[in-house]
Amino acid sequence: VHIDIAVIAAPAADSFGNANGLSGDSACGLLGFALADSEYADRVIVVTDNVVPFPCVPWQIQGNNVDMVVAIDSLGDPSKIVSGTTQITNSPDRLLIAEYVSSFVEQSGIMRNGFSFQAGAGGISLAVIKFLRDRMKERGIKARFVRGGSTKHLVSLLEEGLTDYVLDGQLFDQDSVRSMRDNPRHVSTSPFTSYNYHGKGNFASMLDFVVLGATEIDLNFNANVVTHSDGYLLHGIGGWQDCLFSKCTILAVPSFRDRIPVIVDDVTTLCGPGELIDVVVTERGIAINPR
């Protein structure tokens, strides 16, 4: 896709165009998803409400690629980063699913010193982090790295010494913003290094397991994450497909949502082929892909 103009909102920038998301009243964390736009667009405009003296470091966007810096009064309210989908679930069924996942990870031997994982920012995934944290503390196990998007639950693993590093591509609350700003072991990454299938530094395949959601899963372990059974588009896929290249891909879903089955004969929209899905966990139990 040829990009004519890229407009990048940056919570901090200098007059040369070096920019980051770590400081200022609008701090949101990191700008990794805008990196490709800044490098490939014909014209790049950085918009900021916080012009700082050169150099603005660390520079997540390099001024060498920026044509213009525009100062405005306010970029927005960073507290709105948090949404209802980035809260730990209160549902007994979903908490049971999370408990099953953490138990599987422990009993299968995946949870060991030096392991790595990614859990998303949905309610079940956040509960998995909580339960996994308890099991790691009980057994004295420390991860080498965990992969964000981060919330305070992932940050707690770093601050409690349960992981050496958090490698992050997206932040979902102000605790994560603070952590990345203040803790050198909370590292910002870009899609080039984390999820680019063609990138030599792609570390998605280094993850020992990932926990993901889905809108539908069929009997052949194929998964849909972008539509419901009515076929209407819900949202973008994001990095979901790239996560499937982990060593163990776990889909944690309820059997039903609003009385509509999540486990179906055939998915409405194929987003992830069954050959890349290893485990499906619902409140009714654990299904392991025989392939």
Question: Where are each of the predicted segments found?
Answer:
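Core structural elements
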Residues: G120-L126
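Active-site histidine-anchored catalytic micro-motif
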Residues: G148
